Amino acid sequence: HAFHDGIGVEADAAEAVYWVRAAAYQRYGEGMHRLGVCYEYGDGVEQNWERAVHWFREAAESGVSVAMADLGYCYEKGCGVEQSWEQAFSWYRRGAECGYPVSMSNLGLCYKRGYGVEQNWQEAVKWYEQGAQCGHLQSMNNLACCYEDGEGVEQNEERALYWYRRSAEGGNGSAMCNLGRCYKRGYGVEQNWQEA
């Protein structure tokens, strides 16, 4: 990161990639993931989604949970691989089971929408809850939506408002809008146009 971010040295993308590549070739998980990110964004190398997927897969198979999420994203969007919700679901699940909150949120979405798996609201709520408990802001917002709409859980205005507020206070824009809507409508709180 020193050469990439210019920490203690002048920033040098080519030098950063040299060292990241050296770490990746030594089978260092974080190095493999970072090299995948370089290829994903064209950071110090020419952008190449197929190479990004290769290194995400190598890192994911070595146990790097963020690489599992990134590989799931590639399958979800069809970047560097043929689009496959089943593969996206599989990698999100592996990342979630390793404790990575972004994967928990994405896995919840798969269960909510039936992407790559049979729709299951209770499983969606379970994974949103786990992501929220880890401090993941989007998971908090998604969980609040479930409580607001009574999807996968019993409708509960207080819980919806609680999770919207926590997510909004953390900076999640969607949660800010949802919290404002609650104040506008008087949902779970006294109607307050100024607060909205």
Question: What is each residue range found by the language model?
Answer:
Residues 2, 190-196:
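Low-complexity/repetitive intrinsically disordered segments
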Residues 28, 64-66, 100, 136, ...:
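Residue-level recognition of tetratricopeptide repeat
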